[in-house]
C-alpha cells in the first residue's frame, strides 16, 4: 500500500493531483489514517505530527503522485444579518459559544443546531439550511499551526500544541 508522508498547502504550484479524498471538516485533523480515495484506491497517511488539512491541500504520495484534499458537503446553517455590524454581533455570539464557524463577508456558516438557530433568529438573523463544503476559521490556538511555514525539502512541520 502506498504511503503519504508529506503534503503541500493549497495553492502550491506544481503538478496536477492524480486523485482526491473528500473529508468533512471534523475528519481533516489527521496524523495517521487509511484514506479511501475517490477511485476506490487506499493510501496510508503517516505523518510525524497531526495536521489540520484545508480544502485544496495536496498529499504527497511516496511514488510522487499528489492527492487533493477536498472539503465534503455538510449540512449547515447559512446566517445572514441586517448589516455588517449585526453580522459582527452574530459572530460574537457564536464565538462566545465556541462554535466552529466559517465567517465570510456577507454570511456565516455553522453546523446545524436547532437551539442555536432559535437563538440567532431571536437576535434578528436570517437562517437558512444549506449543504456545501465547510471550512471553519481556525481558532486562536491554531494560529501558529497554519500552512505558511515551510521547512524545506517538501516537508512541512506543524505545531498544533
Swiss-Prot record:
GO MF terms, alphabetically ordered: nickel cation binding; unfolded protein binding
Example of a GO cellular component annotation carried by this entry: cytoplasm
InterPro entries cross-referenced by the UniProt entry: UreE, UreE_C_dom, UreE_N, UreE_N_sf
Keywords: Chaperone, Cytoplasm, Nickel, Nickel insertion
Compartments reported by the entry: Cytoplasm
One Pfam family this sequence matches: UreE_C
Annotated region described as Disordered, given as residue ranges: 138-161
Coiled-coil stretches: none
GO biological process: protein folding; protein-containing complex assembly; urea metabolic process
Main location: cytoplasm
The organism's place on the tree of life at top rank: Bacteria
Membership in a protein family: Belongs to the UreE family.
Function: Involved in urease metallocenter assembly. Binds nickel. Probably functions as a nickel donor during metallocenter assembly.
Protein name: Urease accessory protein UreE
The species this protein was found in: Agrobacterium fabrum (strain C58 / ATCC 33970)
